[in-house]
């Protein structure tokens, strides 16, 4: 099964750039933007501007099984790239 990757760059509340990918089974920008905002809120970055300018469809790909399970459970998976908070263990 192919999943859809939305490349996302947003300005954080402190001004630095947060770069991450939203991976979902829906090839829909509105849904990807909603997932991006949900994840940003979960890391304490509220009310950031996220539009189709910041969250753009990039490509479709297959994903590892654990990623697919998370997508099927939560609707999406975030691949943290640059400027993202350190993952808590």
Feature roles, as predicted:
Residues 1-18:
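Short, charged/polar N-terminal "headpieces" of proteins
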Residues 6-8, 22, 36, 78:
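Generic structural hydrophobic/aromatic packing signal, biased to beta-strands
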Residues 17-43:
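Short, flexible N-terminal segments of the mature chain
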């Amino acid at each position: 099964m192919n999943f859809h990757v939305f490349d996302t760059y947003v300005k954080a509340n402190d001004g630095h750039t947060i770069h991450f990918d939203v991976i979902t089974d829906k090839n829909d920008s509105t849904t990807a933007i909603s997932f991006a905002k949900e994840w940003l809120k979960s890391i304490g970055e509220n009310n950031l501007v996220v539009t189709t300018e910041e969250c753009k469809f990039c490509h479709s790909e297959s994903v590892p099984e654990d990623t697919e399970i998370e997508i099927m459970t939560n609707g999406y998976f975030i691949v943290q790239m640059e400027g993202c908070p350190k993952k808590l263990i």
